[in-house]
Amino acid sequence: MKLAPGESFGEQVAKFKACLQKFNRVHSLTNYDDLDAVVRDSLSGVEFISCHPRIACDIGSGAGFPGLFLALALPLCEWHLFEPNRKKAAFLTYAKVSLALANVKIHAERVQDGAKLRADLISSRALMSARSLVEICRGFYDENTTFLLYKGSGAEAEAKEFRKEFTSAHCEIFSGKNALKNRKFLVIKGAK
């Protein structure tokens, strides 16, 4: 999928940065030196989304990477951001309201405890192994769901381990153009 951010995209990113800086002073959510690079990294996964998802979930959303930025980039998609840490979920709610993101719902809970829904896309950034993530997402996906997992240098070994258990799933590894150093994307389709 090609990313074509609207005119207000840069303004939205600037608003997000201001929200994060304000919240970070009190709650110490992140310590990124180059927030622009992290935003680009979050957006770089869009090129591996082959369809236009209607419903998507971001698991372990933390300070909004990549979930909030994918929601900004895909405004016609309904996004469900799952973050069990109350402080981080409060920030996500604050950012959602500040950015007027009507397409985002914040779930201050673990995904496995949430009300089930079928997502077209499930994203996550370096939260846990692909195998474990797919397992905790049972009830949120079917064989048509795409998993977009932001991984690091161990992606090859992780994909190999995943393929042993999910033999019918299609699992590919990609590198993004604007991703952080060592970023690999694990794209999984057909998990059952």
Predicted regions: what they are:
Residues 134-146:
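A short glycine-rich, Lys/Arg-flanked "PGG" loop and its adjoining helix->strand segment in the class I
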Residues 43-124:
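Conserved SAM/SAH cofactor-binding pocket of Class I
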Residues 154-192:
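Active-site capping/gating segments
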Residues 144-156:
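Conserved beta-strand signature within the Rossmann-like core of class I S-adenosyl-L-methionine
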Residues 78, 103-105, 146, 167-172:
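Conserved beta-strand segments of alpha/beta enzyme cores
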Residues 1-53, 57, 87-104:
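Class I SAM-dependent transferase core
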Residues 127-131:
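Alpha-helical transmembrane segments of helical membrane proteins, especially in multi-pass transport
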Residues 20, 151, 188:
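Residue-level signal for inorganic ion chemistry
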